[in-house]
């Protein structure tokens, strides 16, 4: 995990993922999708750079720490955005696999920056939610060229299974993580040692759960925009009557 606490590694891996995404779209000749993902990436970059100096760093407990704001995490935004871009670029047969790979990569980066004491857990959660929200807005503006080709607009068993599992893990993980925080909250203000285990578990659980929720929703939304649930979108255009 410590390798993802190296800034150059995260930047390099994320840039490679983004480059692969654009290369796939160029090969598939999805020109409007290229513009769509370029705007999405630009907004994610702007959020990482502009929000940090503007947002306050709230006082949580009586603990000596850096007073400067560290939210949202730029490295997590970069990793999550690269994962989303690759997920939106690949064809249907690869979407579920890319979602799982992107989830694992994002979780590793998120936990690494927390373990390296670059960020608080809330910085990572905020970054994930920002990317998820921007991804949904971007997918809501999907053009016709972003759909699967006529005749290939079909449902995907892998997307249904993986998407359902990720969404379930996300929702249940967030609920259980919130329950753990509620249980240890009385001791956090006093930095009680008995809260350490709960803090570690809730941090890892919420990072993994929110990542799963973001990638799971993005996976489902991408499938819906690529193969809308209509006769025209799901199975392609109906055959035209013969001309006389």
Report residues per predicted region.
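Hydrophobic alpha-helical bundle signature of multipass membrane enzymes
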Residues: 1-66, 87-88, 188-236
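Arginine residue identity/basic-tract feature
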Residues: 28-30, 57, 92-95, 120, ...
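Membrane-embedded catalytic cores of phosphoryl/pyrophosphoryl-handling enzymes
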Residues: 63-202
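Membrane-interfacial, low-structure loops and terminal tails that flank and connect transmembrane helices
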Residues: 145-160, 226-242
């Amino acid at each position: 995990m410590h390798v993802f606490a190296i800034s150059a590694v995260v930047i390099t891996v994320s840039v490679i993922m983004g480059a692969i995404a654009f290369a796939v779209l160029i090969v598939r000749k999805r020109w409007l999708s290229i513009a769509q993902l370029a705007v999405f990436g630009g907004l994610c970059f702007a959020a990482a750079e502009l929000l940090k100096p503007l947002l306050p760093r709230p006082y949580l407990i009586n603990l000596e720490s850096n007073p400067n704001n560290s939210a949202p995490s730029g490295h997590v935004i970069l990793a999550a955005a690269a994962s989303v871009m690759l997920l939106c670029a690949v064809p249907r047969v690869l979407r579920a696999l890319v979602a799982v790979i992107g989830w694992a990569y994002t979780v590793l980066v998120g936990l690494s920056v927390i373990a390296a004491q670059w960020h608080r857990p809330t910085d990572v959660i905020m970054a994930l939610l920002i990317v998820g929200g921007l991804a949904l807005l971007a997918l809501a503006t999907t053009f016709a060229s972003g759909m699967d080709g006529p005749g290939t607009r079909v449902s995907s068993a892998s997307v249904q299974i993986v998407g359902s599992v990720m969404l379930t893990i996300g929702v249940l993980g967030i609920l259980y993580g919130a329950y753990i925080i509620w249980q240890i909250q009385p001791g956090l203000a006093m930095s009680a040692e008995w809260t350490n285990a709960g803090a570690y578990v809730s941090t890892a659980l919420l990072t993994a759960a929110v990542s799963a929720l973001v990638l799971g929703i993005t996976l489902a939304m991408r499938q819906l925009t690529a193969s809308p649930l209509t006769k025209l979108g799901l199975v392609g255009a109906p055959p035209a009557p013969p001309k006389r």
